Curated annotation (Swiss-Prot):
Binds 1 zinc ion per subunit. It comes from the Bacteria. Its EC number is 3.2.2.23, 4.2.99.18. This is Formamidopyrimidine-DNA glycosylase. The gene is mutM. GO terms for molecular function: 8-oxo-7,8-dihydroguanine DNA N-glycosylase activity; class I DNA-(apurinic or apyrimidinic site) endonuclease activity; damaged DNA binding; zinc ion binding. Involved in base excision repair of DNA damaged by oxidation or by mutagenic agents. Acts as a DNA glycosylase that recognizes and removes damaged bases. Has a preference for oxidized purines, such as 7,8-dihydro-8-oxoguanine (8-oxoG). Has AP (apurinic/apyrimidinic) lyase activity and introduces nicks in the DNA strand. Cleaves the DNA backbone by beta-delta elimination to generate a single-strand break at the site of the removed base with both 3'- and 5'-phosphates. Belongs to the FPG family. DNA binds at residues 94, 113. One of its GO terms (biological process) is base-excision repair. A zinc finger (FPG-type) spans 241-275. Keywords: DNA damage, DNA repair, DNA-binding, Glycosidase, Hydrolase, Lyase, Metal-binding, Multifunctional enzyme, Zinc, Zinc-finger. It catalyses: Hydrolysis of DNA containing ring-opened 7-methylguanine residues, releasing 2,6-diamino-4-hydroxy-5-(N-methyl)formamidopyrimidine; 2'-deoxyribonucleotide-(2'-deoxyribose 5'-phosphate)-2'-deoxyribonucleotide-DNA = a 3'-end 2'-deoxyribonucleotide-(2,3-dehydro-2,3-deoxyribose 5'-phosphate)-DNA + a 5'-end 5'-phospho-2'-deoxyribonucleoside-DNA + H(+). It comes from Ureaplasma parvum serovar 3 (strain ATCC 700970).
């Protein structure tokens, strides 16, 4: 699943290509992707309007339209956007929604797993929607701090790895970055969140911000299928220190990296550095 850096990379790419172009038509091949509109309603709300800006909220992409509507998209496991010429070949079997612009280009939503979601809301109330109102601050938000995280988790009985994956506590962090953040902060992934001090949360916050920004700079992490633009891959996978490195020597101390399960999620850690 694309995490904060991958979603931000996609947002940056689309902001560079699809803004301020009139939408000519829409094609919906898989109506279940549209969660609160029919294909006919979707087209009626989009045609003859423009995308004026795109923002990220946690792992959601928010398309702000010129008619004061917001299209909220979650890519889930395998969702991808391609901005391509109308005549350019594409995989029709997995392309479920197409937004065609009046410049001959199309924004194509491709999703092999079909788990992605599209919602349309009024701009003045979209943050009150069921799925968006529970999204917490992410580490790159100006209001995010160690104190914020400490207050959220000081009574939590969850393992800190599990807590960092809870989008109602802190948004945007997924399995890859939780492993890397805890390794950098020298915190064992199964320690209970309530047993960590404010100083521990200061380390987590500092490393989360550093790692996420570095990943954005490197266009995210491609381990399995994440791509942006037209099949471009991220580079941050080359910088991972523990995630995917089970049975390899730790690059800091030489101890063998271990892999375990924490609340069902594959978790990589150094038993020495994170002791």
């Amino acid at each position: 699943m694309p995490e904060l850096p991958e979603v931000q990379t996609i947002v940056d790419y689309l902001n560079h290509h699809v803004l301020d172009i009139f939408i000519k038509k829409t094609i919906v091949h898989l109506p279940k992707i549209l969660k609160n509109k029919t294909p006919q309603e979707f087209e009626k709300l989009l045609i003859n309007h423009k995308i004026v800006k795109i923002k990220r909220l946690g792992k959601y992409l928010l398309f702000f339209l010129s008619n004061n509507l917001v299209l909220s998209v979650h890519l889930r496991m395998e969702g991808k956007f391609y901005y391509q010429a109308k005549e350019e070949w594409f995989n029709l079997a997995h392309t479920h929604i197409i937004i065609e612009f009046n410049n001959g280009m199309q924004l194509r939503y491709n999703d092999t797993r079909q788990f992605g979601t599209f919602h349309i809301y009024e701009q003045q109330s979209f943050l009150d929607s069921k799925e968006l109102k529970k999204i917490a601050l992410d580490p790159l938000d100006n209001n995010f701090s160690a104190q914020y995280l400490y207050e959220k988790l000081k009574k939590s009985n969850k393992a800190i790895k599990t807590a960092l994956l809870d989008q109602s506590v802190v948004s945007g962090i997924g399995n890859i970055y939780a492993d890397e953040i805890l390794f950098a902060a020298k915190i064992f992934p199964t320690i209970l969140a309530k047993n960590l001090t404010l100083k521990n949360y200061e380390k987590i916050t500092k490393e989360a911000q550093r790692i996420l920004l570095l990943s954005i700079k490197n266009k995210g992490t491609t381990i399995h299928t994440y791509k942006f633009g037209n099949d471009e891959t991220g580079l941050f996978q080359k910088m991972l220190l523990v995630h995917t490195h089970a049975k390899e020597p730790c690059q800091i101390c030489g101890t063998i990296i271990q892999k375990t399960k924490v609340n069902g999620r594959g978790t990589y850690y150094c038993p020495n550095c994170q002791n």
